[in-house]
From Swiss-Prot:
Motif (Gly-cisPro motif, important for rejection of L-amino acids): 137-138
InterPro entries from the UniProt entry: Daa-tRNA_deacyls_DTD, DTD-like_sf
Source organism per UniProt: Pediococcus pentosaceus (strain ATCC 25745 / CCUG 21536 / LMG 10740 / 183-1w)
Coiled coil: none
Protein name per Swiss-Prot or TrEMBL: D-aminoacyl-tRNA deacylase
Length: 149
């Protein structure tokens, strides 16, 4: 599982000219799964995202979590995070998860995020989406549950 976490002042996702998800301050998450991901990977990612202290406190130090700032999350599936560019100029997506499994994991991931009490808006799995965001900082962190650094 890979998640690109972006601290945003606002973000939205549009499908066929309809805004389907929109948040103010918080996180924009781009989320991808592979066939080896498990419930433990979902739990690890949710725990890290919810507790990650990357919002500034009164001293301008990154010391606050999304809960502390009462932020919201916009979660968008993006299988291209598992692209391989090893050979040639056209990316390979064979490491991306089976769409049926990935869709199920995406729904479970968002449910686990919501269970923490944080507002979670989403895109639509597999849809062609337009994502708009205003990066705050910018602060962008890549979380990979297979490479826990």
């Amino acid at each position: 599982m890979r998640v690109v976490i972006q601290r945003v002042s606002k973000a939205s996702v549009t499908i066929e000219e309809n805004v389907v998800g929109k948040v103010g301050p918080g996180f924009m998450l781009l989320v991808a799964f592979n066939d080896e991901d498990t419930d433990a990977d979902l739990d690890f990612a949710v725990r890290k995202i919810v507790n990650m202290r990357i919002f500034e406190d009164e001293q301008a130090k990154m010391n606050l979590s999304i809960n502390d700032v009462k932020g919201a999350i916009l979660s968008v599936s993006q299988f291209t995070l598992f692209a391989s560019t090893k050979k040639g100029n056209r990316p390979s997506f064979t490491k991306s998860g089976n769409p049926e499994l990935a869709s199920k994991l995406y729904d479970q991931f968002n449910a686990k995020l919501r269970a923490t009490g944080i507002e979670v808006q989403t895109g639509q799995f597999g849809a062609d989406m337009q994502v708009e965001l205003v990066n705050d900082g910018p602060v962008t962190i890549v979380l990979d549950t297979q490479n826990k650094e």
